[in-house]
Amino acid sequence: MNGTEGNNFYVPLSNRTGLVRSPFEYPQYYLAEPWQFKLLAVYMFFLICLGLPINGLTLICTAQHKKLRQPLNFILVNLAVAGAIMVCFGFTVTFYTAINGYFALGPTGCAVEGFMATLGGEVALWSLVVLAIERYIVVCKPMGSFKFSSTHASAGIAFTWVMAMACAAPPLVGWSRYIPEGIQCSCGPDYYTLNPEYNNESYVLYMFICHFILPVTIIFFTYGRLVCTVKAAAAQQQDSASTQKAEREVTKMVILMVLGFLVAWTPYATVAAWIFFNKGAAFSAQFMAIPAFFSKTSALYNPVIYVLLNKQFRSCMLTTLFCGKNPLGDEESSTVSTSKTEVSSVSPA
């Protein structure tokens, strides 16, 4: 065995070294140099300083500007809420524990932090799925002239929270558990042990299939169809500047959406899968820590991709930041409704 399993923890170092101590009681400087913990604290502070204002500004703008409270924008607000949860309940805890060099909040704090971080991440993930389905329905029109209402948008948001809870809650009630991971400063599901008391294997398989593979499949299918539909419409209307513009905007958004998701979560999922299928194999604490902390950046660039590239949100944000005046002038605002109509009115060939 190349790791040490204890009460609610697993340290990726054999206790034959005599160095292993509980990550809830002692600094873990035998896993990584003290400067690495300080670097992690600086990194988390950076994410907090950027993530909280960006996500908070999205929520403030939506509250201030009535025109943003449209059904197709509800899911973007949900993304901001998910990002704020990750920042407030995940990043701040990791910042504190990194400064201390160990998970100083104990097993209960670990369970709460792991739950909130997983919940926020899963709400964001399923929000992307709902966003993909919404745009597929609006652009590809598989159900004909479907009017997307507030009821549909609210149902989509409720769905994201139900799916997120279905992933994040089981470890709190005995199906798997939340334990410190990486350099023991943040918590996540137990991919590491075969403890039959917690049925870790069945939970991890459920999580990978239902909360990673399934969402990825849906996202790729819906956006693949969306791009094909827009390209087909543009090919039939080659002289239409508006259709060409719609094609460019939608294609750019699709590429950024898919890349953003894969860049954030694929390294973490890949490493977790490797650890799960290679129980007992030797690996360093940094091997899991780096992708785990890198995935947290999704809370930062999600609003950049899904909100700041939305002309309507961008215009309102600038108006809010500059006390009611848009420094870019009226041109930015005037193109909002036109662009929205262009992308939404593309019909299948």
Curated annotation (Swiss-Prot):
Residues with glycosylation annotation: 2, 15
Transmembrane portions of the chain: 37-61, 74-99, 114-133, 153-176, 203-230, 253-276, 285-309
Protein's job: Visual pigments are the light-absorbing molecules that mediate vision. They consist of an apoprotein, opsin, covalently linked to cis-retinal.
Gene Ontology molecular function, alphabetical: G protein-coupled receptor activity; photoreceptor activity
All ranges on the Cytoplasmic side of the membrane: 62-73, 134-152, 231-252, 310-349
Maturation and modification: Phosphorylated on some or all of the serine and threonine residues present in the C-terminal region.
Localisation per UniProt entry: Membrane
The organism of origin for this protein: Carassius auratus (Goldfish)
Membrane topology: Multi-pass membrane protein
Domain of life according to the entry: Eukaryota
Protein family (similarity comment): Belongs to the G-protein coupled receptor 1 family. Opsin subfamily.
SS bond list: 110-187
Topological domain ranges for the Extracellular compartment: 1-36, 100-113, 177-202, 277-284
Name of the protein this chain belongs to: Green-sensitive opsin-2
